[in-house]
Amino acid sequence: MDRTWLLLTWLLLLCGVVQGNQESINQKYHDVCSGMYSKEDFNGKVDPYISFTLEELSLADEDDDGEGVSVAVFDFQDYEHIGVRLPNGEIQYICDDYALDLGLCEDSSEGQFIIQETAIDPFTSKEHKLTSQILTFTQQELGTNDKVYSINKTGYYCVTTSSFISSSSKFKATVNFRNAYGQLDASEAYKMPIYAFLAVAYAVCTLVYSWLCWKHRHELLPLQRYILVFCIFLTADTIFVWMYYIIENQKGNSSVALHVYMVFISIFSAGKMTFTLLLALLISLGYGIVYPKLDRTLLRRCQIFAIFTFAVCVAFLVQKYSQNSESLSNLILITAIPLVLCLFAFYYLTLSSMNKTMTYLREQNQVVKLNMYRKLIILCYISLFILFLGLLVSTFAYVGMDTVDMIEQYWKTEFLITDTWPSFVYFLVFVIFAFFWRPTSTSYLLACSHQLPTDMENVSEFDLDDINSLSDEALPNREPRNDYQEHDHNMDIDLASDFEEVPSVNANTNANNDVLFDVDYDRDAKNDRSTT
């Protein structure tokens, strides 16, 4: 087998880095790799090592007592040192009778992998020596081998196996990549402190937003209640993910309880994604900002579609986790295709609704609300730009590396590209979004703003009873002032008599005034007239 194909095989293995401390291998899938930290780089209670446990062995010929499994443990940088290239271009990996006849190995190494002290790099054609030791042995008996591979430096280590004497023999074994800090895979080690930080950050944001909601509980919009519930949900979801990595680090990934817990987290992850899409769709439709309430039929359709998307997402994640990663099956498409269609539908509906809402606000000259939606669009574009920027930077970081160096370094930053970076971007976007729609003493005026539509066709979209009820809820918490109530009463009369007339409530008309809706302007003017 050519070394180029061997390198490509390990490159594919890197794309599916072991998701835990232990990995199963057999006669069909006989290679496995994982990053390992030295005790100096990531301190812990034990010295890191790699061990091999043979669980099953089915001999092709029961009379052949010498048959077993050949094992080699090595640093990936030294993969060229395994095997010897023959004159015909093929590579002889195992020290068998043929290799002994050619003098490629000694009798004491029979059944083991052939190791070369010096090798030629296929990319640079330069000779180089071993950077780390290569452990090779044979095993015929079931159980854990006495020989373990000690990790003295941080690197990407691999275990390759082969059944010697007969290629038709079957076996099953477990490789234990034991790091100093615990059972968690090295590529996920930093997820524990990262998710701990995110859990604390979400908890702080939830406390702050809860305090604002309690402080302005009589002026809350329905949308702000949605955001509060979502804050609590995101905090719980992040804590559960953090606890998952802590449990896996302590117990390993082989327990049934951990797999059940993984399904539970999948449900939460599906809820997080679905709730995000639903919230974005409701805002794009103008819920709570442009209109105090949406049409009941339209709102029900959004909720039903969100529930359907949630069910499809849960089915996809459960199928993904329950399916054996070694068995490539197209059955995953049964749930993957509907999920992609649902996500595309959400994406299309959100953008089209956002465009219609902004067009409507522009036609009605509702400048304040239009600016809020513009900020939201800008925030979405910036978040996408940051996501792609992180991907671009990570890509260029590996441009100057050769294939071996890239494989050696990728596992250290893989979690940043696929998990941490999107999680941090999502957190920042959500915090900024929640800040835009935070509860204030005047935030309820966004829903009952007097900067109303000027066409009679849209009158039905604004329920004056909702406006009055919102105003009545807020007034008891303020000192009773007859002139304000008189002004509010006259305002309703003006709205009922002539809907096209814009009331005298100013929506940031003064360049030096930072107040969104100055509800005291007319009252002060009226008092000035009465004094004169």
UniProtKB/Swiss-Prot annotation:
It holds the Pfam family PTM1-like_N. Glycans are attached at residues 152, 253. Its main location: Golgi. Residues 21-193, 248-262, 323-330, 397-414 are lumenal. GO terms for cellular component: clathrin-coated vesicle; cytosol; Golgi apparatus; membrane. The keyword Zinc-finger does not apply. It is found in: Golgi apparatus, trans-Golgi network membrane. One of its GO terms (biological process) is retrograde transport, endosome to Golgi. The chain crosses the membrane at residues 194-214, 227-247, 263-283, 302-322, 331-351, 376-396, 415-435. Residues 215-226, 284-301, 352-375, 436-532 are cytoplasmic. Keywords: Glycoprotein, Golgi apparatus, Membrane, Phosphoprotein, Signal, Transmembrane, Transmembrane helix. Belongs to the LU7TM family. PANTHER family: GH17801P, LUNG SEVEN TRANSMEMBRANE RECEPTOR. This is Uncharacterized membrane protein YHL071W. It comes from Saccharomyces cerevisiae (strain ATCC 204508 / S288c) (Baker's yeast).
